[in-house]
Amino acid sequence: MSIVLFLIVFILLSLIVSRYLYSVALNVPSKIDVVFNPIEKLIYQLIGTKLEHMSGKTYIKHFLLFNGLMGGLSFVLLLIQQWLFLNPNHNLNQSVSLAFNTMASFLTNTNLQHYAGETDLSYLTQMCVITFLMFTSAASGYAVCIAMLRRLTGMTDVIGNFYQDITRFIVRVLIPFALIISLFLISQGTPQTLKGNLVIETLSGVKQTIAYGPMASLESIKHLGTNGGGFLGANSSTPFENPTYWSNYAEALSMMLIPGSLVFLFGRMLKTKLQIHPHAIMIFVAMFVMFIGFLVTCLYFEFAGNPVLHHLGIAGGNMEGKETRFGIGLSALFTTITTAFTTGTVNNMHDSLTPLGGMVPMVLMMLNAVFGGEGVGLMNMLIYVMLTVFICSLMIGKTPSYLGMKIEGKEMKLIALSFLVHPLLILVFSALAFIVPGASDALTNPQFHGVSQVLYEFTSSSANNGSGFEGLGDNTVFWNISTGIVMLLARYIPIVLQILIVSSLVNKKTYQQHTQDVPINNLFFSSVLIIFIILLSGLTFLPDLMLGPIGEQLLLHA
């Protein structure tokens, strides 16, 4: 019942926040301008930008330039952190390969971690690299999504200004929301301090080091920005990062809030601020139905437990790798949310999930469109929508069109490329991991689960998720460089292609939609969309899943 109430709260808050995002995205005057306008003007002056409208190519150029600059500075800081201030625990510099991986990970909103924050980062890099990139990577994804929606919905004749979009989103959304979440987490017991690690003497007389630091400020944006990287190596399974039952719900809801709101924002941009277009509601329904299906699947297999243990007379569900304060139910919920919304934070160890329970987060990342991350999740779903409309139109002998814009050969080539990037990166690099000498030495499990570890690592990297089957010994040159490359390619190639798709569509003459066109405003469309998503991904990844989690499940029952 608590999960049902939680999901109802998610839907209601998404509806409310989407109205606020409408005002932010379209520069609608509001009473709070008196607070935020001076801050934004100061930022524009500091970075020396003029608020001129950009073309699609200019927008993407500045998006890539801004990200490249942030990545370069972050990379340097990680290489010299031991010689800088705010390093009370005297942590050393990261190696070149690890610094590259960390930079690529947080720059792309992935937050894959091949390090433990308490031993491999100073407080300076935790704040000025990790937390900073959590804000800017989330804002970058939001900005390109809003630029895409502006042109797609015909709300404006221009794509907007990249620097204005990220500034308004950070100042008006991320910072205020993150501040509220931080204060709540502090009230629950999450530390926020610049003091060094605490050394205590236990009851048995042994000295123990307790790692803490500026955690609450990182935890809030970690979830709100669908980032996922933890201050500590064990992430949100630790009592400091996620102290209570209520903090667990707050962190889960934070992950879902903005991606869910963006779908309704799309509907408001198609209609009015106070009304949501039925097409966006049908997209939300499709996403939500798939989310519920995967959640129920994960819950079922985790509560079913391990058949090998059952044969030994040990009954009960699968509690391995889970915190007793959360149990199986909240662990499965968190697992499904963190991979559906491509956050990557964990409150339990995914490597300890049952084979088919662990396949749920893997498949959600393979789909990469069940809500997804900040901005890019909706962009990915719109690619599936266009594919569905195109195929359905051809099946009934109609000219493929979307929102009154014809989908022709040029657009379909770009759509196909955008769709293929994700599976190609996963499958090619997974194959390389078994071919390159020494790469498979990182595997800690033989047979099917070893395949699952490799597949999960590259799926997580390509989906900009960041969670992992952490039995993999991944802090090696091969794994640092290969996953770093995957994260960068999977982030930037689809975004560029998706902006090109929309730019191509809006340059066409729009026409009045007819009743003979494929209907996109009813539950039938939602059903067909779900079927196409499952079929396309199933045909792509099923052979690999047979070699991994499905094979492992069959082995348990052998």
UniProtKB/Swiss-Prot annotation:
Family note: Belongs to the KdpA family.
Membrane-related topology note: Multi-pass membrane protein
Quaternary structure and interacting proteins, as annotated: The system is composed of three essential subunits: KdpA, KdpB and KdpC.
Pfam families the UniProt entry points to: KdpA (PF03814)
SS bond list: none
GO cellular component terms, semicolon-separated: membrane raft; plasma membrane
Subcellular location(s) of the protein: Cell membrane; Membrane raft
PANTHER family found in the cross-reference section: POTASSIUM-TRANSPORTING ATPASE A CHAIN (PTHR30607), POTASSIUM-TRANSPORTING ATPASE POTASSIUM-BINDING SUBUNIT (PTHR30607:SF2)
Main location as per UniProt: membrane
Classification via InterPro entries: KdpA (IPR004623)
Function text: Part of the high-affinity ATP-driven potassium transport (or Kdp) system, which catalyzes the hydrolysis of ATP coupled with the electrogenic transport of potassium into the cytoplasm. This subunit binds the extracellular potassium ions and delivers the ions to the membrane domain of KdpB through an intramembrane tunnel.
A GO MF term: P-type potassium transmembrane transporter activity
Name the record gives this protein: Potassium-transporting ATPase potassium-binding subunit 2
Species, as recorded: Staphylococcus aureus (strain N315)
Superkingdom of origin organism: Bacteria
Keyword tags: Cell membrane, Ion transport, Membrane, Potassium, Potassium transport, Transmembrane, Transmembrane helix, Transport
HAMAP family assigned: KdpA
Transmembrane spans: 1-21, 60-80, 129-149, 169-189, 246-266, 281-301, 326-346, 353-373, 376-396, 415-435, 485-505, 523-543
